[in-house]
Amino acid sequence: MSTSALPAFLPRASVIQYPVCVDRANIVIIGGGVVGCAVARTVSRRWSDVFLVEQMPKFGMGASTRNSGVIHSGIYYPPGSLKARLCVAGNRMLYEFCATHNILHRKCGKLVVGHDEKQQAELEHLAANGRANGVVGMRMVDRAAVRAREPYIDAAFALEVPSTGIISAEDLIKTLARMATEQGASLLTRARVVRLDPRADSVAVTLIEGDNEDGAQRSEETIEARCVINCAGLYADEIAAMLGNHQHRIYPVRGEYCELVRAKSYLINNLVYPLPHADGLSLGVHLTRTLWDTVLVGPTADYVAEKNDYERNRLPVEEFVRRAKSLLPEIEAADLQLAYSGIRAKLVPPGHAGIADFVIERDANVPHAIQLIGIESPGLTSSLAIADHVVSLAAEILS
């Protein structure tokens, strides 16, 4: 494996060359997104012989960096759910972590806006839900207060949520990966898991180098792990299925973004959201001023057939104008250019409504495996809290 294909931020000492030449490990983490890197950093503080394997050339190339980069507050999720608990805890942990480790972020707050009495009642319900989850500092503000903060936004009132912010997910992943390696963890990219074989006191993890798309023969390497942690994101259901766990299926939902042209970036100062979709599919097309002073419009939310279908049949800019016009009346098609898209790991199938909770649990039939499935938003915000939760499950296995 060429080291030129590895992330620049990975210390050379952390690179594992094929063959792996390791027979056994305490922990193998599958998936090197923000959650996988957070788990690697946390578990390697407690245990030695920790391995993180990622099939892509760099860490965080999937959903972890193809999003709005928002630090969520926890107002949307059902009280008592893992999403609510881990988001609220993760919000506090993430701000502290960013301050300590000089990770680029901004605690800017956000406005969730409304236009009529019905929407005002929905905003008040959203605030009550947030308070039940432990979110503090929220308040309802009137049109004048909205205009003072966002002069070009049309809203009769809004829920102000000061604990929301934005973060450089790339910086966060870089720091987590570096800390994991400094603590002795071994990180491997371009390593695809092709087989998981449960044994009496371990799971055998079989890897091949690369994506195998060229059809070339690849040698297999196997690590016998006392604990396997599935952090494979969009592919977590496929990893679980290798252990005979078919309980959950991931339905990919693509979210597309546009960006305001630079000349119109003055139209938005911070974060402005509509009320979330009633079906729970998304938070709606919102406006995000990034850390680089660009303004994102999106994401949309549409089910797609393939987990890597980022670009086929992209929506035209006119569709973004239609969806954003109720927030920003001045927006026109000429103000927008297509940006990137991301794919979310939804557990709710097409045609159904509701918010599915994170699945974070020991596998019911394979006692040495921990499954993390359906880790979509607020996964970035929750990542450090998720890692702490996973440590407690790993301790049950490794004690």
Residue spans of the language-model regions?
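Dinucleotide-binding Rossmann-like beta1-alpha1 core, especially the glycine-rich loop
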Residues: 69-145, 149, 155, 284-285
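Flavin-dependent oxidoreductases
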Residues: 38, 196-298, 302-311, 322, ...
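N-terminal Rossmann-like FAD-binding beta1-loop-alpha1 element of flavoenzymes
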Residues: 25-52
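Short beta-strand to alpha-helix junction loop
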Residues: 78-89, 113-122, 160-179, 188, ...
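Helical element adjacent to the flavin cofactor pocket in flavoenzyme catalytic cores
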Residues: 159-226, 384, 393
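C-terminal catalytic lobe of FAD-dependent flavoproteins
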Residues: 282, 309-399
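Glycine-rich FAD pyrophosphate-binding loop
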Residues: 44-66
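Extreme N-terminal leader/targeting segments of oxidoreductases
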Residues: 2-27, 45-46
